[in-house]
A protein has these predicted regions:
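Predominantly soluble domains enriched in secretory-pathway, periplasmic, or organellar proteins
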Residues: 1-156
Length: 156
């Protein structure tokens, strides 16, 4: 038995997700507990920027294929943040329930698909957000524990 006299250590950042930039040598780390996104230059492996999110507990992120916008789920608020990576400005969209989880952007960069967990016995949902308008445009129930989400392009 080893007792070092210390309790369990919890990171002040509590990273939950890493998203690579589609055109630059950068990755973005989601700091759930620190309410921030951390930009890392992958050529030098150094932090090059840290920016606070517009709400609490960012969880997952995705970046548009042109690298201009980042969509961030704010699990602590039941909202989605759409951030313009060039200007730094953000817009918030309310999700249909309180526990926003996964996010993926459509290949045409028009929509963000957000998996939203149900609470208790409630079904989870898939919210669809128009990225340019920063507006919820559709939602559908998908069953319990709607967690992550992914899209892929099928070519003929």
């Amino acid at each position: 038995h080893m007792d070092h006299g210390e309790g369990m250590f919890h990171s002040k950042v509590q990273p939950t997700w890493v998203t690579p930039h589609p055109t630059d040598s950068k990755v973005y780390v989601t700091g759930n507990a620190s309410h921030e996104i951390i930009e890392v230059d992958t050529n030098a492996w150094k932090i090059t920027n840290r920016f606070k999110t517009a709400g609490k507990a960012p969880y997952n992120t995705d970046i548009s294929s042109d690298g201009s916008r980042m969509v961030i789920t704010l699990k602590g608020e039941g909202k989605t943040e759409i951030k313009n990576l060039k200007t730094g400005k953000s817009k918030l969209v309310n999700n249909t329930t309180k526990v926003s989880h996964g996010v993926v952007i459509s290949p045409d960069n028009k929509f963000a698909f957000i998996s939203v967990e149900g609470i208790g016995g409630e079904p989870g949902k898939l919210d669809v957000v128009d990225i340019r308008k920063a507006k919820l445009v559709s939602s559908i129930e998908v069953g319990k524990q709607a967690g992550g989400i992914a899209l892929w392009k099928i070519e003929e």
